[in-house]
């Protein structure tokens, strides 16, 4: 018969100090309850005796202990843990009785309670942090499913152990323990396959009794019960609002029950299908964990929770299989430990257990997630130096007052959505909370992991725009200028007798009304313009003044009327001039009066009345010689036109070009898209080609005055030298450098022309920064006239004969690549400044050479004008006519930015189309991962990437979308040639422009990763540019200089004339990803001292608050110091120093100017 014995060892005590009288313990997969107490994997109550009567809690509690079980003097099992509780019982003649509770070190987590935020970490990573904080390093994970990062995971007002159990249950993790000498290891698993298995099967013995040396199982009962048969979970994500996220999982082994027991729940706490499917299966496993169970008893001490074993010798063959121990209770008695006190009887051991079949997975009971009781207050945070920090969805980062671990910066939280008053598809209301604003945060379904900002509040520092309650009757919408001083405001005053609507624009105030605008003012109207006022009325103007009208002009007044001028007064009409009145008519002047006409000068006069003609003067001369006097003549200047407004339209569905088609079109030197015609609203009338519309009606209550006559167009129109920009001294219009003529070309704008030429041809639109303008600015030459309308093939008959003067600009560069660049660029310029004309009426060009060597070409309904090589040719009726004046090169020098060795219309189009640049980014992964990228692929990739970052012109994107919708497919096929397009599938350019919805572009952008893209192309980019990049050019742009013509002909950027880097230089900035490829320059910028880095997060927050208070109350002292500080850092001045300065900079000021106060703060 086998003999049993028990012993225990406690840290710090001699091995023989304590003897085991008995024990009662429980083990379970994950947590359970034992004797009314929480059991975190295992819990043992051990009865002890000792000859030492004065053992104290200090010697026992929180110490490591190990209970050992011997069989035939061989150690067969051990339980290692910590002493949670210790008690002293009776003191006998020889022994004192004690009792201790042995638990895992994991139970220490139940004594910690916390609130904090974990970001972008997997559940195993979070659990590891919890364990390591308590000094628990003996743990392991055996997981079948890869952990998915949780964007935002909050431990909210719960103990560390509850938080651990909640996360583990959500991910389907269970834990058990492996006991070894001197330690116990916490073991996490998510499948029964990962559990340890006993090396030997355990026999089953139905006939309990007698002396059996081998441990066995008896009293095994197998139980089957009906449970949930199907789980269906559902959730929602704002990133995919139309997607259902519905997940359904059907149970197995359901032959014994109905299959209609569905468990539905929402939200399912997932945001993608992969997690949704896993969570649904975990939920089903939990709900069916009692469907197939077994209970039994044994005397095998090797049985432990979290272990598998094989059963044998059962009379039912189906029971002889593998099983998983889910929970087990152990009992042991050792009465002979007290033989001196009369103890007698054999040492015994037994256990009772619960099992599940080995192929099933046990899931822990899901723990309830803490619910947030109500709204919270938080502060909007972001990087130092920023005022507004948001993402593409308008989400912001926030910091909660209870968050002790974050530094109150952009790492404090996930992106948090912001409730807006109105949110539709590209319409609604948007107001981004700014850094430092206090916001009200609520939580979807009370879930602390799903915060949403639902309101904003003022506090003692952020006060309302007007003092209260003094201005309690005001309703105000006031903004604040970003990175500057000022505000925009719309406010309403509702005090009786003082009602007012107030509107303040810090800079410009623009408005666009698509139809009528009616204003009724029932009292006075005052208008003060402190600079110029421009008004343009494109149809009729009716003005009725029912009392008197006065005008005072301190300078000159010019009135120019193309038609007739009719003036009618009811009584007297008086014209008085200080010096001269000059009346001139082309044919006749008639002055008629009912009773009298008098002409008076000096003392003489001529009077005509019914009595006759009376002449009176000192001397009356008739036919005595002399000459008539002359007047000054008309010398008035024409009024300038007002700045226009582009309509705020939604993005039209754009179109993309396949990358392969781009390369093919590039090789063929042909346009990839049709030239953009003028839109209807941009088209300007040819002379005498427009019938004026009837005058528009004027809304009541005032009756419209009757027009005297309808205006008629004249043959000598003044030039329209302006568009939607302000005039500058050197040229009529000025466009921002970010467009560099691209917007102008898309809108049908071309280069400037002299005023006399503009008069001759009616109208012309000009654009400073246009490529040809940059070449011809000094000579003020080069012109092109668009047709009056190119809508649906109409109005071709209104084309006039126009002069195009292309300036001869001989090539001075020997580099073959540079010469080719100019040829290709001129090809683009010429083909984009023409359009398709009526096929039946085009004529060849007639070359005329001017005396100064320039080309003067008469264009009469030409189909194409193409400049290439050393001549200019016209394609007409299948013939090519080349015209080259003697001794001159026709190649025009290229000064337009962005033209590299592949100066093709396709790449030019890329530069002007932000939506295309963005859509191309989705192709980077496959393009940049290919081996042996050639220069063309690399150039296109880098070019598109850089332009997508640095040419984000929203209005341009909108405009481009409008125009591309109005383009018609090119009528002719792309003709293959020896060098280019040979793909028979691509028959015209329109086939490579499939439409792409704006929402799709947004989706592509959200998935793109610029850094990953740059990582792929970095080696090729570095090898291409690192050695040949000109240091002088880079420094030239750093110093604010401009390469002539915004191009690369006067500044060699590498040996490839890179369009990518030329664009960067145009913006005088280089992204961090490319800095390593640029020449290093000596930097005089000092590094900023980071005083606050020395403090822990709690201390840092306190220091920042006190420093901020000192700075805000410093008057202008801090502002002056900050200005000198920025000067020392080679940074430009700012106006709002207290808002722009970082916390470290403010701390530096306190330390320098008030060191005693600084020492008090940090102490």
Swiss-Prot record:
Binding-site residues, Mg(2+) 1: 743, 889, 1066
Main location: secreted
Cellular component aspect of the GO annotation: extracellular region; host cell cytoplasm; host cell cytosol
Main enzyme class: ligase
Keywords: ATP-binding, Host cytoplasm, Ligase, Magnesium, Metal-binding, Nucleotide-binding, Secreted, Toxin, Virulence
Entry binding sites for Mg(2+) 2: 743, 805
EC numbers for this chain: 6.3.2.-
PROSITE patterns: ACD (PS51772)
Cofactor note: Binds 2 Mg(2+) ions per subunit. Can also use Mn(2+) ions instead of Mg(2+).
GO biological process, one term: actin filament depolymerization
Similarity-based family: Belongs to the VgrG protein family.
Function: Part of the type VI secretion system (T6SS) specialized secretion system, which delivers several virulence factors in both prokaryotic and eukaryotic cells during infection. Forms the spike at the tip of the elongating tube probably formed by hemolysin co-regulated protein/Hcp. Allows the delivery of the TseL antibacterial toxin to target cells where it exerts its toxicity. Also acts directly as an actin-directed toxin that catalyzes the covalent cross-linking of host cytoplasmic monomeric actin.
Protein's name in the database: Actin cross-linking toxin VgrG1
Source organism of the structure: Vibrio cholerae serotype O1 (strain ATCC 39315 / El Tor Inaba N16961)
Protein's gene: vgrG1
């Amino acid at each position: 018969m086998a003999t049993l014995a028990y012993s225990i060892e406690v840290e710090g005590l001699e091995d023989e100090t304590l003897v085991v009288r008995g024990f009662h313990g429980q083990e379970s997969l994950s947590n359970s309850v034992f004797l009314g107490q929480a059991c975190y994997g295992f819990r043992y109550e051990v009865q002890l005796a000792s000859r030492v009567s004065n053992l104290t809690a200090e010697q026992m509690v929180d110490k490591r202990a190990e209970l050992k079980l011997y069989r035939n003097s061989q150690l067969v099992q051990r339980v290692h843990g910590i002493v949670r509780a210790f008690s002293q019982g009776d003191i006998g003649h020889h022994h004192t009785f004690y009792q201790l509770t042995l638990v895992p070190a994991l139970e220490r987590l139940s004594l910690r309670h916390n609130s904090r935020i974990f970001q972008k970490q997997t559940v195993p990573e979070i659990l590891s942090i919890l364990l390591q904080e308590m000094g628990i390093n003996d743990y392991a994970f055996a997981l079948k499913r890869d952990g998915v990062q949780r964007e935002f995971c909050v431990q909210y007002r719960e103990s560390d152990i509850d938080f651990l159990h909640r996360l583990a249950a959500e991910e389907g993790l269970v834990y058990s323990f492996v006991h070894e000498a001197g330690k116990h290891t916490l073991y996490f698993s998510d499948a029964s396959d990962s559990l340890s298995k006993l090396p030997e099967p355990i026999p089953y013995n139905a006939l309990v009794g007698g002396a059996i040396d081998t441990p066995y199982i008896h009293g095994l009962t197998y139980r089957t019960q009906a449970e949930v048969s199907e789980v269906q979970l559902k959730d929602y994500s704002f990133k995919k609002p139309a997607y259902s996220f519905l997940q359904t999982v059907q149970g197995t082994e359901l032959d014994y029950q109905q299959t209609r027991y569905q468990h539905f729940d929402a939200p399912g706490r997932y945001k993608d299908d992969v997690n949704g499917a896993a969570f649904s299966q975990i939920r089903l496993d939990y709900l069916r964990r009692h469907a197939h169970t077994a209970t039994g008893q044994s005397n095998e001490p090797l049985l432990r929770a979290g272990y598998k074993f094989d059963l044998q010798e059962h009379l039912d063959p189906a029971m002889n299989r593998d099983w998983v121990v889910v929970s087990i209770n152990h009992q042991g008695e050792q009465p002979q430990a007290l033989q001196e006190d009369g103890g007698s009887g054999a040492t015994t051991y037994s256990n009772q257990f619960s099992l599940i079949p080995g192929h099933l997975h046990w899931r822990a009971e899901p723990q309830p997630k803490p619910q947030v009781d109500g709204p919270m207050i938080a502060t909007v945070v972001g990087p130092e130096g920023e005022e507004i920090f948001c993402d593409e969805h308008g989400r912001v980062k926030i910091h909660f007052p209870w968050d002790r671990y974050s530094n109150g910066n952009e790492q404090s939280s996930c992106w948090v959505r912001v409730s807006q008053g109105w949110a539709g598809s590209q319409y609604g209301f948007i107001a981004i909370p700014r850094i430092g604003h206090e916001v009200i945060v609520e939580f979807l379904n009370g879930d602390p992991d799903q915060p949403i900002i639902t309101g904003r509040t003022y506090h003692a520092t952020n006060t309302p725009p007007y003092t209260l309650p003094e201005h309690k009757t005001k309703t105000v919408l006031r903004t604040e200028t970003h990175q500057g001083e000022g505000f925009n405001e719309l406010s309403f005053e509702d005090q009786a007798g003082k009602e007012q609507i107030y509107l303040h624009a810090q800079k410009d105030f623009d408005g666009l009304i698509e139809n009528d605008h009616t204003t009724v003012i029932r009292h006075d109207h005052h208008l003060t313009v402190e600079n110029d006022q421009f008004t343009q009325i494109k149809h009729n103007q009716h003005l009725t003044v029912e009392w008197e009208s006065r005008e005072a002009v301190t300078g000159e007044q010019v009135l120019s009327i193309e038609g007739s001028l009719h003036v009618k007064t009811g009584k007297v009409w008086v014209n008085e001039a200080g010096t001269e009145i000059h009346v001139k008519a082309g044919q006749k002047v008639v002055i008629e009066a009912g009773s009298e006409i008098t002409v008076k000068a000096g003392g003489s006069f001529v009077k005509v009345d019914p009595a006759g003609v009376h002449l009176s003067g000192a001397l009356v001369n008739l036919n005595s010689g002399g000459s008539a006097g002359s007047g000054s003549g008309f010398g008035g200047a024409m009024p300038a036109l007002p700045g226009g407004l582009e309509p705020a339209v939604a993005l039209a569905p754009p179109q993309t070009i396949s990358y392969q088609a781009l390369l093919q079109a590039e090789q063929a030197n042909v346009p990839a898209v049709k030239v953009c015609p003028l839109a209807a609203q941009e088209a300007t009338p040819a002379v005498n080609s427009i019938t004026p519309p009837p005058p528009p009606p004027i809304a009541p209550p005032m009756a419209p005055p009757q027009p005297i006559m309808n205006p008629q167009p004249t043959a000598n129109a003044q030039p329209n030298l302006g568009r939607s920009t302000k005039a500058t001294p050197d040229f009529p219009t000025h466009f921002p450098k970010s467009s560099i003529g691209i917007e102008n070309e898309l809108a049908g704008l071309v280069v400037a022309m002299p005023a006399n030429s503009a008069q001759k041809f009616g109208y012309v639109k000009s654009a400073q920064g246009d490529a040809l303008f940059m070449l011809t600015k000094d000579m003020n030459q080069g012109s092109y006239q668009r047709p009056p309308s190119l809508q649906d093939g109409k109005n071709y008959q209104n084309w006039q004969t126009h002069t195009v003067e292309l300036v001869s600009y001989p090539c001075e560069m020997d580099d073959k690549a540079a010469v080719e660049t100019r040829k290709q660029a001129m090809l683009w310029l010429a083909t984009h400044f023409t359009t398709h004309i009526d096929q039946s009426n085009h004529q060849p060009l007639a070359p005329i050479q001017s005396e100064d060597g320039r080309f003067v070409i008469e264009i009469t309904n030409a189909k194409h004008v193409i400049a290439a090589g050393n001549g200019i040719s016209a394609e007409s009726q299948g013939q090519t006519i080349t015209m080259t004046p003697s001794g001159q090169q026709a190649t025009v020098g290229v000064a337009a930015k962005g033209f590299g060795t592949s100066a093709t219309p396709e790449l030019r189009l890329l530069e002007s189309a932000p939506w295309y640049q963005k859509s191309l980014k989705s192709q980077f992964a496959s393009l940049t991962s290919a081996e042996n990228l050639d220069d063309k692929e690399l150039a296109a990739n880098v070019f598109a990437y850089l332009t997508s970052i640095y040419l984000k012109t929203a209005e341009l994107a909108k405009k481009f979308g409008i125009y591309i919708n109005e383009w018609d497919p090119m009528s002719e096929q792309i003709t293959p040639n020896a060098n280019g397009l040979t793909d028979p599938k691509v028959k015209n350019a329109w086939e490579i422009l499939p439409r792409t919805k704006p929402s799709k572009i947004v989706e592509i952008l959200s998935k793109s990763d610029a850094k990953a893209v740059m990582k792929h192309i970095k080696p090729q980019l570095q090898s291409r540019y690192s050695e040949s990049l000109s240091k002088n050019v880079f420094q030239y742009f750093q110093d604010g200089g401009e390469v002539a013509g915004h191009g690369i002909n006067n500044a060699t950027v590498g040996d490839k004339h890179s369009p990518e880097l030329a664009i960067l230089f145009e913006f005088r900035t280089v992204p961090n990803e490319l800095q390593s490829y640029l020449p290093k320059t000596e930097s005089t910028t000092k590094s900023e001292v980071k005083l606050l880095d020395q403090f822990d997060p709690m201390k840092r927050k306190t220091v920042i608050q006190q420093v901020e208070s000192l700075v805000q109350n410093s008057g202008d002292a801090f502002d002056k110091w900050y200005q000198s500080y920025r000067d020392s850092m080679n940074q430009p001045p700012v106006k709002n120093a207290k808002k722009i300065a970082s916390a470290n900079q403010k701390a530096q000021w306190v330390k320098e100017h008030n060191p005693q106060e600084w020492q008090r703060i940090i102490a």
